[in-house]
Amino acid sequence: MGIDINHKYDRKVRRTEPKSQDVYLRLLVKLYRYLARRTGAKFNKIILKRLFMSKIYRPPISLSKVVRFMKKPGRELLTAVIVGTVTDDSRIFEIPKLSICALRVTQTARAGILKAGGEVITFDQLALRSPTGSKTVLLQGKRNAREAVKHFGPAPGVPHSHAKPLVRSKGRKFERARGRRRSCGYKK
């Protein structure tokens, strides 16, 4: 009698193509798959991998963050590359001249960049300009800034937990009575 081998762990799980059926995204994947294979540059492999990622791993980055990263010494003539969205930030008044390549740039962010004399290019333009990723800076937004992440971690109420409780409603009877005031049981 043979042994029934468990094949549960045989498969290596990773994306080899994007889940999205967006034809423009798939054209970019075709282009960067070719570049990653033919140039051997690590930059192209990273871009290709990020194009496969789901939306939660391609978080948006604000224009103010891009400005802050691009103000570092020696980055004046480099192109900021973001596999995701660049959003506007109304808190900044002066935008320096920037060269940005992103999957998507919001209308107001684009207007601000162009007004400052900068440029917004697409990934196919970047491939022509810099096929190996030279003179570029790869940036990405904060992955843990999502609202859902606030609920992760040790359960709310456990000592040293900073997890946000999942509350049905924000009324006075929800998470605001017992343990929060003397009149209802006790005050913590």
UniProtKB/Swiss-Prot annotation:
GO MF terms held by the record: RNA binding; structural constituent of ribosome
One Gene Ontology cellular component term attached to this UniProt record is: cytosolic large ribosomal subunit
Q: What is this protein called?
A: Large ribosomal subunit protein eL18
User: Does Cytoplasm show up as a keyword for this record?
Assistant: yes
Q: Which residues form a coiled coil?
A: none
Per the annotation, which location comes first and is thus the protein's main one?
Answer: cytoplasm
Q: Which UniProt keywords apply?
A: Cytoplasm, Ribonucleoprotein, Ribosomal protein
Which taxonomic lineage is given here?
Eukaryota, Metazoa, Ecdysozoa, Arthropoda, Hexapoda
What does the sequence similarity comment in the record state about its family?
Answer: Belongs to the eukaryotic ribosomal protein eL18 family.
GO biological process: one example: translation
Q: Where is the composition biased (Basic residues)?
A: 178-188
The record, for InterPro entries, names:
Ribosomal_eL18 (IPR000039), Ribosomal_eL18/eL18-A/B/_CS (IPR021132), Ribosomal_uL15/eL18 (IPR021131), Ribosomal_uL15/eL18_sf (IPR036227)
Question: Known Pfam families for this protein?
Answer: Ribosomal_L18
Where are the stretches annotated Disordered? 169-188
- State the superkingdom: Eukaryota
List, alphabetically, the PROSITE patterns matched. Answer: RIBOSOMAL_L18E
